[in-house]
Amino acid sequence: MNITATVLLAFGMSMDAFAASIGKGATLHKPKFSEALRTGLIFGAVETLTPLIGWGMGMLASRFVLEWNHWIAFVLLIFLGGRMIIEGFRGPDDEDEEPRRRHGFWLLVTTAIATSLDAMAVGVGLAFLQVNIIATALAIGCATLIMSTLGMMVGRFIGSIIGKKAEILGGLVLIGIGVQILWTHFHG
């Protein structure tokens, strides 16, 4: 695979993480760049590992992985999105309430895993091609780092406009990504 194809693949794989990061950024009270970078690093690290895991699985049992990865991503994203929507409806904006300035590490890891299962499936497919899987996985991780950090900052802007309802929007985005993954699986 040439460099152009690798870069296009990398940024294509980062789009789900970008959308999820917008939702995450919108739900925080003015996240700092360091929080956006933290999110980008977590999403990028997970997105680097999943094609490597997929590649290894592709060498062993590609049929099972391809058969179930979309369902796993769908369920995780519906769960996380539903949780965000419920949080968004819990009470009005409250001036006395301490605004959230960062997401928990494990929440970000779970979201990153859910949005990177397509990269695992790509890794399975790459097992059957002549590619440098390490370079490809690093390219996907770097693109995801960039796009997730950018997504958090875009989300910051959106969140400052719509306030606590951003939690509902973020949840809807995650559910939308889950539905899109399932739709793409069944309708190509």
Curated annotation (Swiss-Prot):
Q: Mind naming one GO cellular-component term on file for this protein? A: plasma membrane
Alphabetically, the GO molecular function entries are: manganese ion transmembrane transporter activity
Name its cellular compartments.
Answer: Cell inner membrane
Q: What is its main location?
A: membrane
Give TM segment ranges.
3-23, 66-86, 106-128, 143-163, 168-188
Q: Which UniProt keywords apply?
A: Cell inner membrane, Cell membrane, Ion transport, Manganese, Membrane, Transmembrane, Transmembrane helix, Transport
| UniProt key word Phosphoprotein | no
What InterPro entries does this protein map onto?
Mntp/YtaF (IPR003810), Put_MntP (IPR022929)
Please explain the role this protein plays, according to its UniProt record: Probably functions as a manganese efflux pump.
Q: Which family does it belong to?
A: Belongs to the MntP (TC 9.B.29) family.
This protein's name: Probable manganese efflux pump MntP
- UniProt organism field: Escherichia coli O7:K1 (strain IAI39 / ExPEC)
